[in-house]
A protein has these predicted regions:
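Extreme N-terminal starter segment of soluble prokaryotic enzymes
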Residues: 1-5
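Unusually extended, aromatic-enriched hydrophobic runs near protein termini
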Residues: 7, 17-18, 73
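ATP/NTP phosphate-donor binding region
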Residues: 13
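Glycine- and acidic-residue-enriched helix-capping/strand-helix junction motifs
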Residues: 16-30
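Helix-adjacent hinge/juxtasegments
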Residues: 37, 41-77
Length: 77
């Protein structure tokens, strides 16, 4: 069993914490990454956390996860 969890983040999520914090909050994507990695470690999983502003790259990553039989979490934006 593959213990890798891909966490894929889509367009503009790199701006979390800076762009309209009154709407989206002050938590940055890096803070979310750190929390995700800590939780994965507690669960004996490997977190592969990524962000892209390009839909084609996201599709490539989804196919990569499929080829590796990895779990997948997607935050499209």
């Amino acid at each position: 069993m593959n213990r890798t969890v891909f966490i894929l983040n889509g367009p503009n999520l790199n701006l979390l914490g800076r762009r309209e914090p009154h709407i989206y909050g002050h938590t940055t994507l890096d803070q979310i990454r750190q929390r995700s990695e800590r939780l994965a470690e507690e669960l004996d999983l490997v977190c592969d956390f990524r962000q892209t502003n390009h839909e084609g790259v996201m599709v490539d990553w989804i196919q990569e996860a499929f080829e590796q039989w990895a779990s997948l979490i997607i935050n499209p934006a």
